[in-house]
Amino acid sequence: MHTQINKYMENKLSIFLCGYRKGMGAQNCLLYLVNKWKLSLDRSDKCGILFTDLSKAFDCLSHDLLIAKLDSYGFDYSSLKLILNYLSNRFQRVRVNSDFSTWTKILTGVPQGSILGPDLYNFNSNDLFLFLALDVCNFADDNSPFTTAPNIPSVLQQLTNESKLLLEWIKNNQLKANPDKFHLILSEKNYSISINVAGFEIENQHSAKLLGINIDNKLTFDKHVSNLCFKASQKLHALARIRNFMSIKQSKILMKTFILSHFGYCPLIWMMHSRKLNNRINKIHERALRLVYKDDVSSFSDLLKKDNSFTIHERNIQSLAIELFKVVNRISPKIMEHVFPLKETLRYPNENPFVSFKIRTVSWGDGNLAYFGPKIWQIIPQEIRNESNLSLFKKKIRQWKPINCPCRICKNYVPCLGFI
């Protein structure tokens, strides 16, 4: 049933609906947001995003409204009756120690923990993109409208208008919003600026968390990466205490699971951070390798060779290459083609298939993956780029060491001249 419904609905769902869909995740959603924001900042535009909050969205979904929406999508009578039967006549009770409450009938919501629950919630949320005028960063019940404009007053006006439309959609869908928990981030240092949403003043903040990523108004991700480094450093101390009781193989498993794993969530979002933070990440990685191999003499590069591994930054570049491969071979989510647009025609063989962006600033343009990605694709060896199988490409790219990487972290810095 899950497979049949998703196959039928796949082309009916918005490409910007990123949650609970095959091949899509939070990283796709955030990449689209960050890409548009950086491109706008490079043009000297102003940007803003409104983070929203819903209360128990999965538990408040109206069964009758969902069935009506599925009917509009073309579900036949027997299918609608089957889904309504699946949702109806469910009961729940609460257990506290050995005491139980009385059984209560569930009148709204989708069964959480079920394979169909997230699908049905997606189908219910799909019309949100027709209701709103601005772009929306959407993942499950996280809906964050964002916009760009030549000046801050225009951004505020657009977000204010959009918040009214969003609250109206939430009300019409019998969901509950928490405007007092909304957050506003503008590409503006003046934190006294605010917008009014349902009687609540939402003030501009320096940063806020969206889908597990701390997003700041300058898109530096300094706070997010610093938090990752702090968490990884704490685990280093734990590894140091128990290292003598484990083999190298066991220590490597712990290093990858409890230390390096902190840098594995949505790495393409924050990978274009500062060189200072990259050095900090490398230092943590180096300390971890020294503990694993009990080696206080070898250099970081020698430790990597001994471990047959790459730096975190090199791994991130490899991950970026995999996303680019998916786009080139038309197997990526459609939303990624908005991040890495392809040329309509190629004039000669082995031409870079991605649209080249002209940038105006180093701060925003050079750090944008839409600009940086095509450059990375160009330095990948041709025999790897020409691979047609995703699994084989992943295997080869994970063995490829990026050489002559054009990013700010890898470039040489010359005083008075900058990065060359």
For the regions a protein language model found, what residue spans apply to each?
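Short, conserved non-catalytic motifs in the polymerase core
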Residues: 11-32, 48-51, 94-120, 146-152, ...
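Short, conserved micro-motifs composed of acidic
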Residues: 161, 176-207
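Basic, alpha-helical interaction scaffolds
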Residues: 133, 202-269
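Short, charged alpha-helical motifs in flexible N/C-terminal segments and linkers
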Residues: 38-46, 167-185, 209, 268, ...
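Conserved pre-catalytic core of RNA-dependent polymerases
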Residues: 1-111
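Mobile genetic element proteins and their domesticated derivatives, centered on retroelements
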Residues: 1, 5, 9, 33, ...
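Active-site palm subdomain of RNA-directed nucleic acid polymerases
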Residues: 4-17, 42, 118-150
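Catalytic palm subdomain of template-directed nucleic-acid polymerases
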Residues: 57-73, 144-168
